[in-house]
């Protein structure tokens, strides 16, 4: 799941940067907000569709459902709710969402890593905290690239370490 969302969100961040650069070059400043929101919404929709398909497949193959599985499902469901509420609050207050979104991602990722005692995931979660603070100092023009870098460090790198650890366990 970390790899799925890592790639989806990295793609969203990079495409958002490109969209904003193109709109800025055409001085279409009034379109930046709606296009940015639409870009993120499209990528999230695609991500949720892929996740739904992946989870259905995994649940069909699963023989045992543990309390740990239940805990992680609840943790990430609450995290998704926090993302939506945080985005709504940011839009209402007229501030950019990435610092808050990265903070929320850092919390859930760090807790996940601590719970399964997987150091790369803990480090990935902590990197989200650092990127969250850095996002408050970055020009809005580059915030999408910073967000993509945060996702690579927080989801993709730990996700590949986790995948490798799982494969070594199954050998």
Description of each model-found segment:
Residues 38, 48-52, 100, 111, ...:
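Membrane-embedded alpha-helical segments of small multi-pass membrane proteins
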Residues 64-121:
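Membrane-proximal helix-loop-helix units in multi-pass membrane proteins
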Residues 35-45, 88-103, 148-149:
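Structural signature of hydrophobic alpha-helical transmembrane segments
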Residues 1-84, 88:
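Selected alpha-helical membrane-embedding segments in polytopic membrane proteins
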Residues 108-171:
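Terminal transmembrane helical module of multi-pass membrane proteins
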Residues 26-31, 89-97, 139-146:
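Membrane-helix interface and helix-disruption motif detector
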Residues 13-19, 80-90, 110, 127-140:
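Hydrophobic alpha-helical transmembrane segments and adjacent interfacial helices
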Residues 9-16, 41-55, 105-113, 150-168:
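Hydrophobic core segments of alpha-helical transmembrane domains
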